[in-house]
A protein has these predicted regions:
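N-terminal leader segment of winged-helix/HTH proteins
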Residues: 1-38, 151
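Charged/polar positions within long, soluble alpha-helices
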Residues: 17-20, 24, 104, 108, ...
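N-terminal helix-turn-helix DNA-binding core of bacterial DNA-binding proteins
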Residues: 21-65, 70, 75-76, 92
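Charged, amphipathic alpha-helical coiled-coil/dimerization segments
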Residues: 71-131
Length: 151
């Protein structure tokens, strides 16, 4: 294993830990979505209505975990499940107005925290980070096909 790969792996571990800690802090700071709800609502916003099968292909979660997560967003009124408007048999999850509002509030808080963290970075450095993260995600998705919706 090359030293560069080992260092990259360690930095990804550290980043993952920082994100997990930030999610914990944000939940303690108020009425914030948990990580699974935030992820599901983002997917529905970007990808449009999705079936449980669509979500399973994207997230790679087992059925029981995904059912538990989708049940929670339904119970909290963040999404609703409707019949397929194109006539298919699958029922699809749709964002509700409440879900959109909560998602936007959480996104604003998340982006404000990120902007604060990167406040001393130049626009060029932020752009470089975005391109590098996008390239890393694309490489992962090419190797392990899970069709993550894009804006």
């Amino acid at each position: 294993m090359s030293p560069e790969i080992r260092d990259i792996e360690y930095e990804i571990l550290a980043l993952s830990r920082h994100i997990t800690a930030a999610v914990g802090r944000s939940k303690r700071d108020g009425d914030r979505l948990d990580e699974s709800a935030y992820t599901l609502l983002n997917l529905l916003e970007v990808g449009g209505p999705m079936s449980i099968g669509d979500l399973q292909r994207i997230l790679g979660l087992d059925t029981s975990t995904l059912n538990r997560q989708t049940s929670a967003v339904l119970k909290n009124g963040l999404a609703e499940r409707r019949g397929d408007e194109s006539g298919g048999l699958a029922r699809r999850f749709h964002l509700t107005r409440t879900g959109r509002e909560r998602l936007e509030a959480d996104r604003q808080a998340s982006c404000a925290a990120l902007a604060n963290t990167l406040s001393e970075w130049s626009a060029q450095e932020r752009e470089e980070l975005m391109r590098t993260l996008r390239a890393l995600n694309a490489a992962i998705e090419q190797r392990y096909p899970q069709p993550w919706p894009r804006r």
